[in-house]
């Protein structure tokens, strides 16, 4: 496994809460915010990290990173949309929502042969994890059966598998696990108090309920969020608090920079400050020391220099390939060149104790 359940050494920079706490979202942050278990990260503490002098924050994040991960190790993951468009949800950032005019056409679920060919191409290009996304609100049991076939085909190539399919029931998560699924992605997107500004067709607790079902089935969790949706700094701190206080924290944490797609409600959002994005990466590393922190959507708009800072801040995974679901991504040659210039290697290792 890429990031295992190894318990990290507790320190002032990488404290983790005790196991067994329920998944629930925390109250609106305030100076008197009381979190549900001893050792949890408060929103205020995370905000203080985000506000640290940049060089001090980078040093702390890189120090935590080297305590738990080999220097220069970057996981390469590929993401494929196996069922595109037509989603009944109204996520303000997503071009696959049926109600938005973004030019994305609804397509049926891809065949086993199509997915196998795409996975083999990703493996040949150096990817070690293959992620499959389907634009469903909540898959039906018959959809899960079809996904199980795709999971089996990709596992047969010797790759790790990840899926993002929407909200799951516990029995569906168990079925995916029995098919061999390694990771399930279900992002929290933002802080709970800002969530309804982004999407109104579901509740924050719906996300946490699916994460609970995934954990209960024994599937590793991939869960992160999006920066640049008009949120305030406290909402960024609130997102990281939610992620870091999941018990245990996610094995993979994808951090996205909003891709402003014409036709979506968030298309006119102000671009995120690049250094603010790097700060989020650094604090994610400090608060979730054994997670794979993944640079996800929006890497094209960051540029090489900012990506290099993100790697220094503790990012150790990227989505690899020229397309992420329906948005662009740096091509393989560009990523290979960047990693080579930085002396980084696209290999897969486990967390260090």
UniProtKB/Swiss-Prot annotation:
Annotated keywords: 2Fe-2S, 4Fe-4S, Biotin biosynthesis, Iron, Iron-sulfur, Metal-binding, S-adenosyl-L-methionine, Transferase
Binding site for [4Fe-4S] cluster: 87, 91, 94
Location of the region described as Disordered in the Swiss-Prot/TrEMBL record: 1-30
Domain Radical SAM core: 72-299
GO biological process, alphabetically ordered: biotin biosynthetic process
Listed cofactors: [4Fe-4S] cluster; [2Fe-2S] cluster
A family per Pfam: BATS
Metabolic or biological pathway: Cofactor biosynthesis; biotin biosynthesis; biotin from 7,8-diaminononanoate: step 2/2
Keyword Chaperone assigned: no
Composition bias, Low complexity: 1-22
One GO MF term attached to the UniProt entry: 4 iron, 4 sulfur cluster binding
Class of enzymatic activity (EC top level): transferase
Enzyme Commission numbers on file: 2.8.1.6
Reaction catalyzed: (4R,5S)-dethiobiotin + (sulfur carrier)-SH + 2 reduced [2Fe-2S]-[ferredoxin] + 2 S-adenosyl-L-methionine = (sulfur carrier)-H + biotin + 2 5'-deoxyadenosine + 2 L-methionine + 2 oxidized [2Fe-2S]-[ferredoxin]
PROSITE patterns tied to this protein: RADICAL_SAM
Binding site for [2Fe-2S] cluster: 131, 162, 222, 294
Iron found in the keyword field: yes
UniProt xrefs under Gene3D superfamilies: Aldolase class I
Cofactor, free-text remark: Binds 1 [4Fe-4S] cluster. The cluster is coordinated with 3 cysteines and an exchangeable S-adenosyl-L-methionine.
Any coiled-coil regions, as ranges: none
Subunit structure: Homodimer.
Family: Belongs to the radical SAM superfamily. Biotin synthase family.
Role according to the record: Catalyzes the conversion of dethiobiotin (DTB) to biotin by the insertion of a sulfur atom into dethiobiotin via a radical-based mechanism.
Official protein name in the record: Biotin synthase
Species classification: Bacteria, Pseudomonadati, Pseudomonadota, Betaproteobacteria, Burkholderiales
Name of encoding gene: bioB
């Amino acid at each position: 496994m890429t990031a295992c359940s190894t318990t990290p050494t507790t320190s002032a920079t990488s404290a983790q809460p005790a196991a067994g706490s329920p998944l629930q979202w925390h109250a609106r942050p305030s100076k008197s915010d009381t979190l549900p278990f001893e050792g949890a990260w408060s929103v205020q503490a995370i905000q203080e990290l985000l506000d640290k002098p940049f060089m001090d924050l980078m040093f702390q994040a890189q120090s935590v990173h080297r305590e738990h991960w080999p220097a220069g190790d970057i996981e390469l993951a590929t993401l494929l949309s196996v069922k595109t468009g037509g989603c009944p949800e109204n996520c303000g950032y997503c071009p696959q929502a049926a109600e938005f005019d973004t030019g994305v056409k609804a397509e049926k679920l891809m065949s086993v042969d199509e997915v196998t060919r795409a996975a083999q191409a990703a493996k040949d290009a150096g990817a070690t994890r293959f992620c499959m996304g389907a634009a469903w609100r909540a898959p039906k049991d018959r959809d899960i059966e079809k996904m199980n076939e795709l999971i089996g085909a990709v596992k047969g190539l010797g790759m790790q598998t990840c899926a993002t399919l929407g909200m799951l029931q516990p029995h569906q998560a168990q079925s995916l696990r029995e098919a061999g699924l390694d990771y399930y992605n279900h992002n929290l997107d933002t802080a709970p108090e800002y969530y309804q500004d982004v999407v109104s067709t579901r509740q924050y607790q719906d996300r946490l309920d699916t994460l609970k079902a995934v954990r209960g089935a024994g599937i590793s969790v991939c869960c992160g969020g999006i920066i640049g949706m008009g949120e305030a700094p406290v909402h960024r701190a609130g997102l990281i608090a939610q992620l870091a206080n999941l018990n245990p924290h996610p094995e993979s944490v994808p951090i996205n920079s909003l891709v402003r797609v014409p036709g979506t409600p968030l298309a006119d959002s102000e671009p995120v400050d690049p250094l603010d994005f790097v700060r989020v990466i650094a604090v994610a590393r400090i608060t979730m020391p054994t997670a794979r922190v993944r640079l996800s959507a929006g890497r094209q708009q960051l540029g090489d220099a900012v990506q290099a800072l993100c790697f220094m801040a503790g990012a150790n995974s990227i989505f690899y390939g020229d397309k992420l679901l329906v948005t662009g991504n740096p091509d393989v040659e560009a990523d290979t060149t960047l990693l080579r210039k930085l002396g980084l290697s696209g290999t897969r290792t486990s967390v260090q104790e």
